[in-house]
């Protein structure tokens, strides 16, 4: 038989047997601990990037008196994520189930898919990481996939997919009462840092509950 025929036959056999091989456990399931490690690393990377970029931008462009007036004004410091129900205290956070914490993390991540484009110039001018808005978007997508996998594992063992949270910070940007571009970017960076901190915190709690010896991560 010709080499091409053998290749086609082998491919057909593999495709036919793939479901049976999966059911038989021929493809080992990735341990939950590894999935959580991967998600935590991705969340930490995003949080660190958000924190450092916010701090760099603040030191370069925002005078102290402007910073304080911004943070004390509810109209300018309000983050869109306030519309996503999240715990208001450590006690409330601990009362949430793992699935609830993952769900909230997923919504927070998805709410940033579009807004990172507004920060294109900020990332382009940053001297810290050399990333673009498309890089940050890919980081968010990677974490989204990791969280969906974790949710599926905790629910029924299969990867979970769902509709993307369609509301984003676009509304925050359009309805902003502040016409200064610097302060708009500052406000978005403030919220990005705040939201990524929440995501990392929620995932850390899930990991601590699920993996023995991981609470000191």
Swiss-Prot record:
The modification Phosphoserine is found at residue 132. Keywords: Disulfide bond, Hormone, Metal-binding, Phosphoprotein, Secreted, Signal, Zinc. Pfam families: Hormone_1. The keyword Transmembrane does not apply. The keyword Kinase does not apply. It is found in: Secreted. Residues 1-24 form the signal peptide. One of its GO terms (biological process) is positive regulation of receptor signaling pathway via JAK-STAT. It comes from the Eukaryota. Its main location: secreted. InterPro entries: 4_helix_cytokine-like_core, Somatotropin, Somatotropin/Prolactin, Somatotropin_CS. Transmembrane segments: none annotated. Disulfide bonds join 79-191, 208-215. Zn(2+) binds at residues 44, 200. GO terms for molecular function: growth factor activity; growth hormone receptor binding; hormone activity; metal ion binding. GO terms for cellular component: extracellular space. Plays an important role in growth control. Its major role in stimulating body growth is to stimulate the liver and other tissues to secrete IGF1. It stimulates both the differentiation and proliferation of myoblasts. It also stimulates amino acid uptake and protein synthesis in muscle and other tissues. Belongs to the somatotropin/prolactin family. This is Somatotropin. It comes from Callithrix jacchus.
């Amino acid at each position: 038989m010709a080499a091409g025929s053998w290749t086609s036959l082998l491919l057909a056999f593999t495709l036919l047997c793939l479901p049976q091989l999966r059911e038989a456990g021929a493809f080992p399931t990735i341990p939950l601990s590894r999935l959580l490690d991967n998600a935590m690393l991705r969340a930490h990377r995003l949080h660190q990037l958000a924190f450092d970029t916010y701090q760099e931008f603040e030191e370069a462009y925002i005078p102290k008196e402007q910073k304080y007036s911004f943070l004390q004004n509810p109209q300018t410091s309000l983050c869109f994520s306030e519309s996503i129900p999240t715990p208001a205290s450590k006690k409330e956070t601990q009362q949430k189930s793992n699935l609830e914490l993952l769900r909230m993390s997923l919504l927070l991540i998805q709410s940033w898919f579009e807004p990172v484009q507004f920060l294109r110039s900020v990332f382009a001018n940053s001297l810290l990481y050399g990333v673009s808005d498309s890089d940050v978007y890919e980081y968010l997508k990677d974490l989204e996939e990791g969280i969906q996998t974790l949710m599926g594992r905790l629910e029924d063992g299969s990867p979970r997919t769902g509709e993307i949270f369609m509301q984003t910070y676009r509304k925050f940007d359009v309805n902003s009462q502040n016409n200064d571009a610097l302060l708009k970017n500052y406000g978005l960076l403030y919220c990005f840092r705040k939201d990524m901190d929440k995501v990392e915190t929620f995932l850390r709690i899930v990991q601590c509950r699920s993996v023995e010896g991981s609470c000191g991560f």
